[in-house]
């Protein structure tokens, strides 16, 4: 008998196919077929909450298709699992296409662009009843020469698929294997909560492979080895927000084979009391964060970690209008440019 995780991966396969070879009418019909009419759809800023599959098509996908008429979606991770009675499918990959017309006022390039995504779908009774998804919109801004915020401490590049090339899991679900991966990542996350006791108390080298890669969002960047993770992300992050706290009531953490996925909306609250992260000043402002993650385990260690954070939402909570700053930076490339300052 086919397991529920495999059934759920099969359920979204037609949607994945419709997003690979996109026909707008077929996509609309497929969204209507697989999503419940009252599905809770939560997307990255500036989209935020979307009112069902029709709104998802008209307000989100149609403008993106207008900007990139040859749009396609490529998965490199597809996994599934359950948290209590909540059954999830998690997908990671990137949208790509020729950027022909402006999108969210990001000026077009006429060239191929890519945008990472992490998308999680909760399934009940054969329908998607909830979607939590982050699209790396700052990555598109960067490719258009239009990102107006501080440069990344990590490296900006095309984040790769898993080194093992096995991220689209189709084998029969193995609960023991999934639980072993889940236990490793859970222990690592517990270790991170001891950061105030000192670096050694987190036991990073116990959990992470010596050649680990951490693939952060555009605006933070990617890094290799524990030392790179510490220098280019963790130390600035913890210095700026030492009180960061997970929100277990929102947490969905599940395993499938060597992979573990995490989604929460939001997953963390913090207070920005220190300097050094994203070039932001210590404004003593409370924030929530949306971070959607995937990990790949290898021989008892974590070898790769894909991370997307809704940085545009962080800036929005701080009263920073990234899109307006982008329009100022690119006003001569905006469609309504008149020669006058904005």
Residue ranges and their predicted role:
Residues 1-342:
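C-terminal and inter-domain tail/linker signature
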């Amino acid at each position: 008998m086919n397991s529920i995780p495999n059934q759920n991966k099969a359920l979204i396969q037609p949607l994945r196919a419709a997003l690979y070879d996109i026909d707008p009418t077929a996509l609309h019909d497929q969204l209507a077929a697989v999503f419940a009419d009252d599905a809770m759809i939560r997307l990255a800023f500036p989209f935020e909450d979307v009112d069902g599959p029709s709104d998802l098509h008209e307000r989100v996908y149609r403008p993106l298709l207008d900007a990139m008429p040859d749009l396609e979606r490529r998965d490199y991770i597809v996994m599934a699992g359950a948290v209590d009675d909540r059954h999830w499918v998690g997908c990671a990959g990137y949208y790509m296409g020729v950027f022909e017309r402006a999108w969210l006022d990001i000026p077009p390039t006429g060239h191929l662009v890519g945008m990472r995504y992490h998308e999680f779908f909760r399934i009940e009774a054969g329908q998607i009843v909830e979607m939590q998804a982050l699209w790396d919109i700052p990555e598109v801004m960067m490719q258009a020469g239009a990102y107006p915020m501080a440069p990344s401490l990590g490296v900006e590049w095309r984040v790769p698929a898993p080194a093992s090339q096995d991220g689209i899991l189709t084998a029969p679900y193995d609960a023991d294997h999934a639980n072993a991966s889940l236990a490793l990542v859970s222990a690592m996350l517990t270790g991170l909560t001891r950061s105030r006791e000192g670096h050694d108390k987190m036991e990073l080298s116990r959990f992470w492979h010596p050649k680990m890669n951490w693939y952060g969002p555009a605006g933070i960047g990617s890094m290799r080895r524990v030392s790179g993770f510490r220098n280019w992300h963790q130390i600035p992050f913890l210095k700026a927000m030492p009180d960061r706290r997970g929100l277990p009531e929102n947490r969905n953490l599940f395993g499938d084979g060597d992979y573990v996925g995490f989604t929460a909306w939001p997953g963390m609250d913090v207070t920005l009391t220190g300097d050094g992260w994203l070039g932001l000043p210590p404004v003593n402002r409370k924030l929530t964060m949306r971070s959607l993650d995937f990990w790949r385990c290898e021989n008892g260690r974590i070898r790769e970690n894909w991370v997307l954070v809704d940085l545009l939402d962080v800036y929005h909570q701080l009263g920073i209008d990234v899109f307006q700053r982008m329009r100022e930076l690119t006003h001569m490339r905006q469609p309504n440019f008149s020669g006058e300052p904005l």
